[in-house]
Swiss-Prot record:
Location of the protein in the cell: Cell membrane
Primary location group: membrane
Highest taxon of source: Bacteria
Protein name: UPF0324 membrane protein DVU_2133
Organism: Nitratidesulfovibrio vulgaris (strain ATCC 29579 / DSM 644 / CCUG 34227 / NCIMB 8303 / VKM B-1760 / Hildenborough)
InterPro entries xref list: UPF0324_pro
Membrane topology recorded in Swiss-Prot or TrEMBL: Multi-pass membrane protein
Record-annotated membrane-spanning stretches: 26-45, 193-215, 225-243, 250-272, 305-327, 369-391, 401-423, 436-456, 476-495, 515-534, 549-571
A GO cellular component entry from the record: plasma membrane
UniProt keywords, alphabetically: Cell membrane, Membrane, Transmembrane, Transmembrane helix
Family to which this protein belongs: Belongs to the UPF0324 family.
Length: 579
């Protein structure tokens, strides 16, 4: 019995006041909020007055251009781009933090370049990228000249000629596409030398001590944890290095997948060294990261995209989750209900984040969680490449394509990468819908906790009370929701422009997001190092988990595309026109 209890994602227990400082879920909340509060102090306490001045100037130009022309002019876009360059993390302290949290860099054939890049090597990269940049600049300049001529013609007719206006819009859109390619090429000519060989050991010590505080209060052996953390961190760094290799990056095989692959190879060949095992704290790392993820779910962004996005995320997702679970139970006859629900939520909601919350709510075995996450990572890598290529091949509109990808690709980072492949609109829509979908993490965790208490593990003649649901409910989700509410209030009070600068490009991208990425990588590394192939083998009997995922994702793809088309192009076309 003791062995079974230790093999589930969350152990049962009675609620006590001491849980606040002895339980993992609460420590995930406390540590997450320590980071968020530090971020608010660093980036929100003393904003530069230049930010407000530059924003006001850009908004003035944009308002004047919007009043002058019935479409977004070149001057409008220039002002918009100038505003977009403002970043709260672009300060001495912000740059120092960014350098300290840096992960291994990009490399092609020499892995050492992920850690140390000399000035000569940086200059060589810049020179190699210069020709492509110059070619892109020629095309961008030509597109700009054509756009200027078309806009001038439309202006000459006082913007009263619909044909000239349409032509100007088309030429400006072409310039924006070429300009984006040019900026991407230009970025590759600005590679700077770096050396993170010294900062990585310091970061390892800092993160180890950070998590050790909670380990001490939870009754674990801190010295053994810190020694083991060295091994976990080392494997995580290797995974990040492999995830940034150019070929791996192209095919979407990121650090998360490599963390599990390398960890599993170690665990199932030489075996995970015993000194590392005290630091294999999968849930501790990932729950802390999920609390930080909550700060990225902002209500004002949800409102900005309107009802269409909410329908795509909040109507389709529960339908897909429930139907997939029923399919697994009734048709496939899945032997494990917990594996069924974890895979169903992983596939339908938002990948690993939903999987860990659901696994905690239904007390799934750790091997089941590992299997669900593995399936998610494999299909995420496939979909983030295949979907943009298909959307482009069939000529699907960016808004529709972005909504489709945002509702179906599991990982938030993969959604952004796939959206960026299509263009600005697709990136915005895809990322926003995925963020709206992330809100369901807490809802799904609560729903699964209630269902498992009332229907799956109910005892005859025994009514389910709220206290039992509370015991089952993963408490770290409260931190996720609290972070979302807090930062939504802060974002709303600052206004959309200053929120983008100080919150998105300050607290979040300057501190919490980089740390969240580190925490997730540590968690995936721990999953790999703790996984035994033999323990996973029986779950694949008959290929049922794979069939469940493929069937559910196929249904998800069809229903999401249909809902996105209906909501964005039939019911609310006016919202689509404004995006």
């Amino acid at each position: 019995m003791a062995e079974n209890e230790s093999n589930v994602v969350v152990d049962q227990g009675q609620t006590k006041l001491s849980d606040l400082w002895t339980k993992e879920d609460y420590w995930a909340i406390w540590l997450g909020f320590v980071i968020l509060i530090a971020g608010m102090w660093l980036f929100l306490a003393n904003p530069s007055p230049e930010f407000a001045q530059k924003v006001d100037k850009a908004n003035g130009v944009m308002a004047a251009e919007a009043a002058r022309a019935p479409f977004k002019t070149l001057a409008y876009y220039k002002a918009q781009d100038d505003k977009g360059k403002l970043q709260g993390m672009d300060t001495p302290s912000g740059k120092a933090i960014g350098a300290f949290l840096t992960t291994p860099g990009a490399w092609a054939s020499d892995p050492l370049e992920a850690f140390v890049l000399s000035k000569e090597a940086a200059d060589e990269r810049n020179a190699a990228a210069k020709a492509k940049f110059e070619s892109a600049k020629v095309k961008s300049d030509a597109a700009l000249a054509a756009a200027q001529a078309a806009e001038a013609a439309a202006a000459g007719a006082a913007f009263a000629d619909a044909a000239l206006n349409t032509e100007a819009q088309a030429k400006i859109a072409e310039w924006r596409a070429e300009h984006a390619k040019m900026k991407a090429a230009e970025k590759k000519t600005k590679t700077k030398p770096f050396n993170i060989a010294t900062s990585l050991p310091m970061l390892m010590v800092a993160l180890g001590l950070f998590f050790a505080v909670g380990m001490k209060f939870m009754g674990h052996d801190v010295p053994k944890f810190l020694v083991g953390f060295i091994g976990v961190f080392f494997v995580a760094v290797l995974a990040l290095m492999m995830g940034h290799q150019s070929t791996m990056k192209y095919w979407g095989i990121g650090a998360e997948a490599w963390a599990i692959i390398i960890g599993m190879l170690v665990a199932n060949t030489v075996g995970t060294p015993s000194f590392i095992k005290p630091a294999l704290q999968v849930e501790y790392y990932i729950k802390t990261g999920l609390v930080l993820l909550g700060a990225e779910v902002l209500f004002d962004k949800i409102i900005a995209i309107g009802i269409p996005g909410i329908f795509v995320a909040w109507v389709v997702t529960p339908i897909v989750l429930i139907c997939t679970f029923i399919f697994g139970q009734k048709i496939l006859k899945m032997p494990s209900k917990t594996l069924n629900i974890v895979i169903s939520s992983d596939m339908s909601v938002c990948g690993t984040s939903a999987a860990i919350a659901t696994a905690a709510a239904c007390r799934a075995k750790k091997e089941e969680l590992t299997l669900a996450i593995g399936l998610s990572l494999v299909f995420t890598a496939i979909m983030m490449i295949a979907m943009p290529a298909f959307i482009k091949a069939v000529g699907m509109p960016q808004v529709l394509g972005g909504a489709w990808m945002g509702g179906t690709i599991d990982a938030t980072g993969a959604v952004a990468a796939a959206g960026a492949f299509l263009g600005e609109k697709a990136l915005y829509v895809a990322a926003t819908i995925k963020m709206i979908q992330n809100v369901l993490i807490g809802v799904v965790a609560f729903g699964v906790a209630v269902y498992w208490c009332a229907r799956v593990e109910c005892r005859e003649g025994h009514s389910v009370g709220w206290i039992e649901i509370w015991h089952r409910f993963p408490k770290f989700v409260l931190g996720f929701l609290a972070a979302s509410v807090l930062f939504s209030v802060i974002s709303g009070s600052l206004g959309s422009d200053m929120s983008q600068i100080m919150v998105n490009q300050g607290v979040l991208k300057g501190l919490s997001s980089p740390l969240r990425n580190w925490f997730f990588c540590l968690a995936f590394t721990s999953i790999g190092l703790a996984t035994n192939f033999r323990e996973l083998a029986h779950y694949f009997k008959g290929g049922k988990p794979l069939i469940l995922y493929v069937a559910g994702q196929s249904f998800n793809l069809v229903l999401t595309l249909a809902m996105a088309y209906v909501m964005f192009y039939i019911v609310f076309p006016e919202i689509t026109a404004k995006i």
